[in-house]
Amino acid sequence: MGTEFNGLFDEWAHTYDSFVQGEDIQYKEVFAHYEDILEDVVNKSFGNVLEFGVGTGNLTNKLLLAGRTVYGIEPSREMRMIAKEKLPKEFSITEGDFLSFEVPNSIDTIVSTYAFHHLTDDEKNVAIAKYSQLLNKGGKIVFADTIFADQDAYDKTVEAAKQRGFHQLANDLQTEYYTRIPVMQTIFENNGFHVTFTRLNHFVWVMEATKQ
């Protein structure tokens, strides 16, 4: 993941919170139970938390309220500016992404929501291998994102979006890198993690991977 999505992130920054509230009918199901998804990620995290894709700070705020120490990473300047308005003044957000970031001294949990699909499957593997080196035994990765049980589930979801006239959603599903559960299970296990997948709406699953 380089800078190819930064323009999209900057453009989306000022409307992102309306998206997650379900105001765009095409993405209403993608963000169904949004607050519950964030809470689930928070509840599965512990200790010092490295968050990728801070966005407008929604997950970050919940992590801080839960008493976590958070190190935030966000590539978009516009997103960082909006998040800083919502978060405590002393909280700093570092420019970076899933593959290129300043490494904090000690991390217990790595979290992200609605962002890991910006990486190709090969890049996902590189990222998870890197995180495996950062985490001690018992450390965790907790990612919530749109993924699919298998190819058939993906194909049916794309076709359903087209049938409903949700052409922007269908295009999104076909142009970004939404992966399959077997792919992610292999990536995690090959890098020394035990992983479980929990579905929280039609699109989003929470991946909870524990370093062995």
Curated annotation (Swiss-Prot):
Coiled-coil boundaries: none
MF term (GO), any: S-adenosylmethionine-dependent methyltransferase activity
InterPro entries registered for this protein in UniProt: Methyltransf_25, SAM-dependent_MTases_sf, Uncharacterised_MeTfrase_YrrT
Record-listed S-adenosyl-L-methionine binding positions: G53, E74, D97
GO biological process: methylation
Presence of the UniProt keyword Membrane in the record: no
Gene3D superfamilies tied to this protein: Vaccinia Virus protein VP39
Family that this chain belongs to: Belongs to the methyltransferase superfamily. YrrT family.
Entry-linked PANTHER family: TRANS-ACONITATE 2-METHYLTRANSFERASE (PTHR43861:SF1), TRANS-ACONITATE 2-METHYLTRANSFERASE-RELATED (PTHR43861)
Function (record text): Could be a S-adenosyl-L-methionine-dependent methyltransferase.
Name this polypeptide is given: Uncharacterized methyltransferase BA_4603/GBAA_4603/BAS4271
